[in-house]
């Protein structure tokens, strides 16, 4: 007995940064990141984290993600997680991260930048994908309230690596240097963990409400929740209780 299976496999190499960023045609057809606008009207849900694993190390894509975190549908905000390029054209050493971050123009308070990919066995994952999963798992363990940072939370990976799979061994001192650039990374301290709580606006902006990833995420969530909760009061007469 034999079984033959056929199908069509999507070729990810055919996707370009321009496809990810997207556009609005003259006929009003939206594509790429422009579709983010459709999330709330279609699902009545607000975006929480924007990411484009495998593409966000491109400056055009990372700029687009940062821009799309603010004023979604004119009122909502969220965060994005981007990768700092760790290919041969990017940062292959920890002290190159600052230069590469600046090259990609990653500076938003709503952006969490991650340097290094992650290995699980022989499979390589973009750092942004793993960081987003760790962030959502942290939220789930906290009643879906995003006030706890994913920083220093254990994650089940077997190695930190460059984009080509070359393993990178960072100690805490080196990982802290990466953090000082406003970039998170992976640290093996009795098991791998996400290491870094600064948003990409750091060190240029040290305001706690902008600098700390957990604070930035909570403010976005709280603002979005407030808007949805009290939208029903729009056009109602003002009274002391409502104030």
How does the language model describe each region?
Residues 73, 77, 83-85, 89-243:
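Structured, hydrophobic secondary-structure cores that serve as assembly/anchoring elements
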């Amino acid at each position: 007995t034999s079984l033959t299976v056929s199908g069509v496999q999507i070729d990810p190499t055919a996707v370009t940064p321009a496809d990810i960023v997207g556009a609005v045609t003259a006929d009003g057809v939206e594509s790429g990141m422009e579709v983010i606008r459709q999330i709330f009207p279609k699902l009545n849900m607000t975006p929480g984290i924007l990411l484009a694993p495998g593409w966000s190390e491109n400056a055009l894509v990372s700029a687009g993600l940062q821009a799309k975190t603010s004023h979604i549908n004119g009122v909502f905000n969220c965060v994005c997680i981007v990768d700092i390029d760790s290919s041969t054209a990017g940062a292959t050493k920890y002290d190159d991260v600052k230069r590469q971050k600046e090259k990609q123009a990653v500076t938003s308070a709503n952006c969490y930048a991650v340097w290094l990919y992650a290995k699980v066995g022989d499979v390589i994952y973009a750092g942004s994908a793993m960081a987003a999963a760790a962030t959502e798992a942290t939220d789930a363990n906290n009643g879906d309230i995003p006030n706890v940072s994913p920083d220093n939370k254990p994650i089940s990976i077997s190695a930190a690596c460059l984009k080509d799979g070359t393993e990178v061994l960072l100690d805490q001192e080196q990982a802290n240097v990466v953090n000082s650039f406003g970039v998170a990374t992976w640290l093996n301290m009795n098991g791998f963990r996400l290491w870094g709580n600064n948003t990409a606006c750091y060190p240029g902006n040290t305001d706690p409400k902008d600098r700390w990833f957990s604070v930035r995420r909570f403010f976005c969530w709280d603002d979005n929740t407030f808007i949805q909760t009290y939208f029903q009061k729009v056009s109602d007469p003002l009274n002391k209780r409502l104030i």
